[in-house]
Each structure stands twice: as structure tokens, then as C-alpha cells.
Design a protein with these regions (language model features):
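Conserved "HGTGT" condensation-loop signature of ketosynthase/thiolase-family condensing enzymes
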Residues: 1-83, 123, 131-151, 157-159, ...
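A short, small-residue-rich loop immediately preceding and capping a beta-strand
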Residues: 84-90, 112-118
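Short conserved active-site loop signatures built around small residues
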Residues: 95
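Active-site histidine-anchored catalytic micro-motif
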Residues: 98
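Conserved RecA-like P-loop NTPase ATPase core
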Residues: 102, 160
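Short, high-confidence coil segments that cap the C-terminus of an alpha-helix
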Residues: 111-112, 316
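Short helix-loop capping/hinge motifs at secondary-structure junctions, enriched
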Residues: 165-170
Length: 432
């Protein structure tokens, strides 16, 4: 692909990865094909352009490079994909969810081939954010071992997801089939995972159920494995709860010890690790263990092989890739050597809208908005901003301990979302 010099670094990396994926798949140019799509995940989008904007003169040209939404269209422009082009922003699960969404598009008959993946760069904005959270390990991350923090990385991973018939018709090589995926939410905390691992286990179990496999069929799991104490403890618990007694031949590793945490690109890059592990029958290692760490690992690992330091050969039929992100965004996906058809359409069901919530400069409820709209009063510069206050939170039962931690945009979303649920007469409880 040519002509990406003016793009943000995140888009440049993604364009490079997409070009490599298309070449590997034996694809050239989509020539506007309406069933060729691009789905790209990212955590921070054009972070380098954000830094450049504030550090080097606030150039207007930097603004259009900042949003996460700028990445997928630039990839689509390079390969002339004429189908669905969209971006996924579910933090560090974005890359995995992009691949899962690509499969759903194909199964629904909306696409034949999708470039799916993720991209993020090392930049001042994410570095400062993780530094302020005291989440960085000064010595390099050590997943499932020291668990004292993450190491930031950067990169992009893209895979070509294709319907079985479309790939077969053009005599394409097939690495594997995507059997199933699961996505869930912790609904717990903006950064910390649920300590009981319930959200993670929901995503894993959904992926296994959707794949039609038994737990014992999974030979290898590429874990989220960030190297933070809370994440690794929750992931240890999730893996043991699901697989202990069901799978005594499971291998698990975190490749973040080699790549660093590539944020929204992590799931896609780790999908590539997982697919290559599957196709080469090689379990990749978790690096960073010293001799004195082995006894402690043995206590935590039980019968699970966490692959310390060395790769090893293993006959693999199905593998799993897990991404458990900030905000409780959980995703799990299963790749398999088993042949199959991924174009089965889901049964069409009637869909209805049952609730509406709005936060606008003209009012923070549908009734108020409509009443002010009827007056036909033009908005002035003084009242162009939307705002929410204590009266909105109190009316919806939102506690200060929740909304005081949110930025303005998240506060607006929380109020409009809760208004919609209230309008739909849908009660939010700890169970749903």
C-alpha cells in the first residue's frame, strides 16, 4: 500500500499490517467490492497526532488524524473495500472484538471477506495515563510471575477473515476456522477487573458454547496476561475455574512478555500468535521466569502448563485467544484446524426500540427536548453545550461515588443511557 505518509502512526502501522495480510492471503485490490469490509480496533487512536497538535503548533491537519474512527477508513481507502468499514473502541479487547465482529458480518451474509484487527502506537498520551495509574513495571512486565505492572508496546495485527465458500472458490490457503467467540462486560470498575473473574468466565464460556467444542478440546490459550496483580489473579482464577477437572492437558502463555501491551492492537497481534501456534503445533512461552520463580508458579499453575521461558511442540487442534480490557471489556475467540462453513445465516428476528434517552443543549429528557424544540428557539453560543448535574443523577439513582470518577463525556453517556433504560421500563440490577 502506498500514500500513508500523512497518516497518524497508528494508521500507518495498520496499513502496513493490512497490506501484509492481503499479500499473504493472495488478495490484491478489492476494487470497490461491496462485500469487502474493514474492521479495526484501537484503544487510543491517533495518539501521536494528539501529542503533535499540542506540542508543535496546533496544526489543523493533525485533528483529522486523532480519532479512532480515522484508522479503518484509511485502510479501506488503500485497498478500496466498498463494504462495511468501522472501528471498534473497546479498549484493549478491541482487536479481538474486531475479529469476532468480522465473523458475525460474514455469517449474516453482509460480507464475504473482512480485514480485521487492531492498531495502537506508543505515545505520550497513553504513557502518561498508565504512569499516572502507577501501572507500569520499571523492569519489564512479567505475566503470571512478578505481576508488578505492564510494559507498553506498539504495533498492529490484521487477519483476513473470509467465508469458506469465497476462500474455496479462489483456491486460497486456509490457516484455520474461527469456530466461536464470546464477549461480555464486568460492569464493575473503569480499570480493575472483577476479582471473582465472573465477566472473564462469561466470555470464555460463550466462546466455547458458540464453538460447539468441549473444554477438553482447547489445547492452548493465549492469555491476556498483562503482568498486573489484579488482572493476573483474576485470570488465574478464571482459567482454573473453567478448565480444572475438564482439561488436564491445557497450555497457557502470555506473549505480552515479548511484545509489551499493544493496547487495542493486542488482541489482534495475539490472534496471529494463536493461529501460528495452531498451524505449527508450537506453544509459545511466557518469558521472564527465573529459577527461584518456578516453585511459586507451580503452586499457582496446578495442572495447567504456563510455558515458562521455552516454546515447545504440542499437537494442537483448537486454541483460544483471550482479551480482558479496562472497563470490564472481555472477549474470547477460538481458532481451529477443523474445516467448516462460516457463512451460516442467523435466523432473522424482529427488532424493536423500547427506550430513548437524550442529553442535549435543549434538555436532558425527551419531553424537555421536544418542548424546547416546539418553541423553535435558536441556540446561542452561550447555550450550545450539553450538561448534566446533581438533579439528573439523583433522578436516576446514580451515586456520587460513581459519577464523580467520570469525565464529562462519560457523564453525558451515563445519564442518556440510564434515561433510555428508564424509558424502556428496564430495571438495572446486580444480576443483569
Amino acid at each position: 500500500f502506498e500514500g500513508s505518509e500523512d497518516a497518524d502512526r497508528s494508521a500507518q502501522l495498520c496499513i502496513k499490517a493490512a497490506g501484509e495480510a492481503m499479500k499473504d492471503a493472495g488478495l490484491d485490490d478489492f476494487a470497490g467490492d461491496p462485500k469487502a469490509s474493514v474492521i479495526i480496533g484501537s484503544c487510543v487512536g491517533g495518539a501521536v497526532s494528539i501529542s503533535d497538535y499540542y506540542e508543535h503548533g496546533k496544526k489543523a491537519s493533525d485533528v483529522t488524524k486523532m480519532p479512532i474512527s480515522s484508522i479503518a477508513p484509511q485502510v479501506a481507502g488503500q485497498c478500496h473495500a466498498g463494504g462495511v468499514v468501522t472501528n471498534i473502541a473497546n479498549a484493549c479487547a478491541a482487536g479481538t472484538i474486531s475479529i469476532a465482529y468480522a465473523c458475525e458480518l460474514i455469517r449474516a451474509g453482509k460480507a464475504d471477506v473482512v480485514l480485521a484487527g487492531g492498531s495502537d502506537t506508543f505515545a505520550a498520551v497513553p504513557y502518561a495515563g498508565f504512569l499516572s495509574l502507577h501501572a507500569l513495571d520499571a523492569d519489564g512486565c512479567s505475566p503470571f510471575n512478578r505481576c508488578t505492572g505492564i510494559t507498553l508496546g506498539e504495533g498492529s495485527g490484521v487477519v483476513v477473515v473470509e467465508s469458506y465458500e469465497h476462500a474455496k472458490a479462489r483456491n486460497a490457503k486456509m490457516y484455520c476456522e474461527v469456530l466461536g467467540a464470546g464477549v461480555s462486560s464486568d460492569a464493575h470498575h473503569i480499570t480493575a477487573p472483577r476479582p471473582d473473574g465472573e465477566g472473564q468466565m462469561e466470555a470464555i464460556n460463550r466462546a466455547i458454547k458458540n464453538s460447539g467444542l468441549k473444554k477438553s478440546d482447547i489445547g492452548y490459550v493465549n492469555a491476556h496476561g498483562t503482568g498486573t496483580a489484579k488482572n493476573d489473579d483474576a485470570e488465574f482464577l478464571s482459567l482454573h475455574t473453567i478448565f480444572d477437572g475438564e482439561n488436564d492437558n491445557l497450555s497457557v502463555s502470555s506473549t505480552k512478555a515479548m511484545t509489551g501491551h499493544c493496547l487495542g492492537a493486542a488482541g489482534a497481534i495475539e490472534a496471529v500468535f494463536s493461529i501460528k501456534a495452531l498451524t505449527t503445533n508450537t506453544v509459545v512461552p511466557t518469558l521472564g521466569f527465573k529459577d527461584e520463580d518456578m516453585d511459586k508458579l507451580a503452586e499457582k499453575a496446578g495442572k495447567i502448563d504456563f510455558c515458562p521461558n521455552k516454546a515447545h511442540e504440542k499437537e494442537l487442534t483448537s486454541v483460544m485467544n483471550n482479551s480482558f480490557a479496562f472497563g470490564g471489556n472481555n472477549a474470547s475467540i477460538i481458532f481451529s484446524k477443523e474445516a467448516g462453513n462460516v457463512t451460516v445465516k442467523e435466523e432473522k428476528k424482529p427488532l424493536v426500540i423500547t427506550g430513548i434517552g437524550v442529553v442535549t443543549p435543549s434538555g436532558n429528557s425527551v419531553d424537555t427536548y421536544v418542548a424546547n424544540a416546539v418553541k423553535n428557539e435558536a441556540l446561542t453560543e452561550a447555550n450550545l453545550r450539553s450538561s448534566v448535574g446533581k438533579e439528573d443523577y439523583d433522578a436516576l439513582g446514580l451515586k456520587m461515588s460513581f459519577y464523580r470518577k467520570l469525565d464529562n463525556f462519560s457523564q453525558l453517556q451515563a445519564v442518556s443511557g440510564m434515561e433510555a433504560l428508564k424509558d424502556a421500563d428496564y430495571a438495572v440490577t446486580g444480576d443483569n
